[in-house]
Amino acid sequence: MLNVETVKQDILAWSENFVEVPHPALGGWAPCPFARKARLSGTVNILVGVNPYFDLKNCSRWGMGKYEVIIYAYNPEEFPYARFHQALEDANQEFLLRKDLLVLEDHPAETEMVNGVCMNQGKYALSLVQSLSKLDVSAEQMANKGFYHTWPEEYLASLFNNRKDPR
């Protein structure tokens, strides 16, 4: 069983030291330009999950509350990538999208590379839940600023799966 305090420390350190930091290979942008504000305002909820599908089903019932993002962390050895991915995709299709929610995944077994930069947290299987409509508005704002210009098309196609493509 994962220790919730260790998980929180690890994920917040990853956010502060990578996700929020501008990178030259990403056009000088941070991987997520909104992460720092969410972290500093306390609108990130990090939980140790039990079962990805059912955790997300409960999240769809409860909603986001005051949070911009709800992150469930799992031991990737207990949830291999194929099983984890399918659970998250099923959750999106079966109940999250109709509640204006979207779950994005991060799993150490599925390396996400953008212009030579590894985007993964690397230690945990993560499901990151956000408001779909807010995510679409934010993506459009960033597209208007040129945020996606340096990102590979193949990566963007998968990123905007189940979402409005702002480009």
Regions found by a protein language model. Give the residues of each.
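Expand to "…catalyze enediolate/carbanion chemistry for C-C bond making/breaking, isomerization
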Residues: 1-167
